[in-house]
Amino acid sequence: MTRLGKPTGPRPGFSREDVVEAALALGVADFTLTAVAERLGVAVSGLYRTISSREDLLIACLERIAARMSLSRTGVTWQEVIRAHAMSLWALLERYPGLAGVIMSVPWAHQLFAAPLAQAHQDLIDRGLDGEDAGVLLDFVGDTVIATHAQVEVMRSPITRSRTLSSPGATDDAVPGGHRADLTGLEEARRFATTAGESPMPAVLSPDDSWIGRGGLDRKIEIIIRGVEASR
């Protein structure tokens, strides 16, 4: 909710940039105004001298992240350009955990990346794709990279056992001291896979270490590229 009226009183001892960096340090998906204020050592009300709302701060965070997206423009072919774009986007998602989820869940979030997307779109056109194909390719690859990273984040993170005890074969294991032994998402997926019985997943789709690496991203991108090549 936007705060109405002009803030009064002395100028704050911190800048809007300081507030943005504090929010990013807490996590673009997780920050709260209370946590940001605590990190800066000020009252929440003091933040409203530099921002108008949490949404305003999220916009500023996404603008900062987009400005830090490094696009390689050295590719000779459109195939090289789209591979480089996918890797640049992946690197950005690695740098800012939770960003994939924000882009997927906040309807306008992707619009803050208009500048790098426009540049990538033009680079594809300059290397032989028409505008529509270039746009669809960027959208397809972007969706693939973002969705893959979101799932990889789940597989890397601890899963609270109480959320999964209803699944087949689940037990309320505990470690010394009475605390539940949380598993990572990958470990939980592997545990679940052992209970599949007569309906196991195909080996190529079964949990493995790639699920906490790049999630088969490179192969997915190559399949997309081959599809575009075949349609031309």
Please provide the spans of the model-predicted regions.
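Short, amphipathic alpha-helix enriched in basic
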Residues: 6-35, 39, 63
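Amphipathic alpha-helical interaction segments
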Residues: 18, 56, 84, 115, ...
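HTH DNA-binding helix-turn interface
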Residues: 27-28, 41-42, 48-58, 98
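Short, basic, alpha-helical segments at the C-terminal edge of helix-turn-helix-like DNA-binding modules
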Residues: 64-69
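Hydrophobic alpha-helical connector segments
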Residues: 70-115, 131-134, 138-141
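Amphipathic alpha-helical packing segments from all-alpha helical-bundle domains
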Residues: 104-140, 182-199, 215
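A contiguous pocket-lining binding segment that forms or flanks enzyme active sites
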Residues: 118-179
